Amino acid sequence: MSQQDKKLTGVFGHPVSDRENSMTAGPRGPLLMQDIYFLEQMSQFDREVIPERRMHAKGSGAFGTFTVTKDITKYTNAKIFSEIGKQTEMFARFSTVAGERGAADAESDIRGFALKFYTEEGNWDLVGNNTPVFFFRDPKLFVSLNRAVKRDPRTNMRDAQNNWDFWTGLPEALHQVTILMSDRGIPKDLRHMHGFGSHTYSMYNDSGERVWVKLHFRTQQGIENLTDEEAAEIIATGRDSSQRDLFEAIEKGDYPKWTMYIQVMTEEQAKNHKDNPFDLTKVWYHDEYPLIEVGEFELNRNPDNYFMDVEQVAFASTNIIPGLDFSPDKMLQGRLFSYGDAQRYRLGVNHWQIPVNQPKGVGIENICPFSRDGQMRVVDNNQGGGTHYYPNNHGKFDSQPEYKKPPFPTDGYGYEYNQRQDDDNYFEQPGKLFRLQSEGAKERILQIQQMQWKA
């Protein structure tokens, strides 16, 4: 049936006899409560807005394909990387961080760079940014960052002095602040920026050998940025500049691509590394740990419905596949709890059943039978009458010991260790970054800092 031939019904399929005129007591009388279509429409409308993401609320996304171009099987046995030429479906969501859903795309802000790969071993979520570092290295400060960069409780306005008051209390923030205030602080759009996993992760191979890795995604479109003046001009004419650019590029077949690289550090190198290799405020120098090409991803299909896919997509650092693992990075460890918890609040405990979040490479029928019930359990018959406990005598859903990860190295006693006593090398890397800038770029960094502090 064509769109023109469709007839209007309510959500339960009842024919709607009149779309324009409410049922009233007489032609000028009050409404009758038995106008079921009016009641249905208004009650649906009153509830259709779901909670906004606490960070990364304004986003754009697209489906695509990841392709392996180089062999890294000596580092990892993850099947997504098992052979050159292998392709995996994926979804990407890019975002600003501090702004709300209606924020302008061209604001000075970090950009979120979140990727979901639908592998045959489950979904792999890489929740990154367009910068390789962050403002701090302990997750206890994350709530305060949210408060500082969002709206002031008294004025309900965003306040640059709150930002600077917070940042200047954290000497380790200088690296991220330098990047944010540099020419790369405002990407021209989402296609012309790099992405980073930022955290240190680990990979392990068939022999159980573990290496630490950082992940990089370099745009094949080249880096393009905006000055403050250019950004202000764009915002004055349209707040959705990056979203429009990405959508229109994909619609006309100009598919954006990024090349994936890893940096690799052995466990022995990590023990002897000058700084804490798991410190999110620092990078690994490329001359010491060179970039190793892995593959590329291409975004080639726009969602048919923004809410269905871009708004409801749920990323969590806990979504990781065999062959990949975590690290002692404290910020990563904090995100292992926070992201999944936030998605369960925002979308419900069964948000994994939303199509964009389903583990397409595994099959919905093979999902854990011990997670049952909950609001909106709809797509898998709630596992029917199958066994929902373990151990059982039916031989169903046994563990898979072949997927056990190699032992995770730790040291020390549980204690609130003073991070500043462990590492106070705050200025070496931001200093090197600043000195790499052109004289004009250095001047712009200082001008932006002065302007924002006076704001």
From Swiss-Prot:
Superkingdom per UniProt: Bacteria
GO cellular component annotations of the record: cytoplasm
Disulfide bonds, paired cysteine numbers: none
PROSITE patterns registered for this protein in UniProt: CATALASE_1, CATALASE_2, CATALASE_3
A Gene Ontology BP annotation from the UniProt entry: hydrogen peroxide catabolic process
Region (Disordered): 1-25
Molecular-function GO terms, alphabetical: catalase activity; heme binding
Its biological purpose: Catalytically inactive.
Family the UniProt entry places it in: Belongs to the catalase family.
Name of the protein: Catalase-like protein
